[in-house]
Design a protein with these regions (language model features):
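Active-site neighborhood of glycoside hydrolase catalytic domains
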Residues: 135
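Active-site pocket-lining/capping segments in soluble small-molecule metabolic enzymes
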Residues: 2-124, 128, 132, 142-298
Length: 298
């Protein structure tokens, strides 16, 4: 297994519905952040139309001109031919790598002999599937969010046996509310007693998703359109040493402009010299430790 030399950090796509102006301001600041790679694009719902394909491409060009590697993220749940046609515009952009979160996008990239990033929403749980994706053009794989370090170690051993371990990078989503499930239903609209077809894109009122509490007042989930997300914030900032020789890129999911400072905090603690202060019932790292997802273990 190849040992990494330098850990790279990525800023994942904004998963929430923000206004075009908010996004433009966010990515102007992202251009000056310490992120090596920046993902952007609508990854949740095609009804979020405030920012058009051309707008995303303009922001991508601005980021690339500043030296960032830019990746265009795409929908995790493609439900209509019209959505597929719009995704073709992303795939055919001519400049930027694509993050495929649906096998339809994998096929679009493969048909054009284009490399792609396999997103964490793809159901990829064994080395044979990784080999198939790699043959189709995968150059980076972001592992599913619910899987552990032990599982990753075993997976990469299988990849070594298949002779593909050195043919792609490994990325792990390490900060943010985790997307746990996707549905054709819109839970944010339902929480406001609106049908999905008449949702009025009410998700824009919840810039970090809508909290969902248990009867014991525990924040168990966050609703974000068709996504159900973890209630606690996943934070692997103190687990970076355990990623050595396994992970090439650490992804942080945007939760506002304070995410830029969090990237710096991760970098500062890469060797364990500046541990992050994590709080029970707010932060979690259970999945990485092969525990219940909402657990926090030192």
């Amino acid at each position: 297994m190849a040992v990494r030399n330098v850990m790279k950090y990525s800023l994942g796509p904004v998963l929430y519905y923000w206004s075009k102006e908010t996004l433009e301001d966010f990515y102007q600041q992202a251009a000056h952040s310490s992120a090596d790679t920046i993902y952007l694009g609508e990854a949740v719902c095609s009804k979020r139309r405030a920012t058009k394909v051309g707008d995303w491409l303009d922001m991508a060009k601005n980021l690339a001109s500043g030296g960032k590697q830019v990746v265009l993220s795409t929908l995790a749940l493609v439900q209509a031919s019209s959505e597929l046609n719009e995704l073709k515009r992303y795939v055919d952009n001519g400049d930027f790598l694509i993050e495929a979160s649906d096998l339809g996008v994998v096929n679009l990239c493969a048909d054009r002999n284009l490399p792609f990033v396999a997103g964490h929403a793809l159901n990829c749980y064994n080395a044979v599937t990784l080999r198939l994706l790699q043959k189709q053009g995968m150059m980076r794989w972001c592992m599913p969010v619910e899987l552990s370090r032990d599982w990753l170690v075993n997976m990469l051993k299988q990849c070594e046996e298949l002779g593909i371990r050195d043919k792609f990078e490994v990325e792990v989503l390490s900060y943010g509310h985790l997307p746990l499930a996707y549905s054709a239903r819109c839970f944010t609209a339902r929480s406001e007693d609106k049908p999905k077809d008449e949702c009025e894109t009410c998700c824009i009122k919840y810039p970090n998703g809508r909290d969902m509490l248990s009867q014991e007042n525990q924040q168990v989930f966050v609703l974000n359109g068709i996504q159900t997300m973890s209630g606690y914030v996943y934070n692997l900032g103190n687990e970076l040493k355990s990623m050595d020789a396994l992970v090439d890129m650490v992804r942080l999911s945007p939760m506002g402009t304070n995410t830029f400072a969090m990237i710096d905090a991760f970098r500062a603690n890469e060797n364990g010299a500046a541990p992050l202060v994590l709080e029970a019932h707010s932060d979690c790292n259970g999945y990485w430790k092969r525990l219940a997802g909402l657990e926090l273990q030192a």
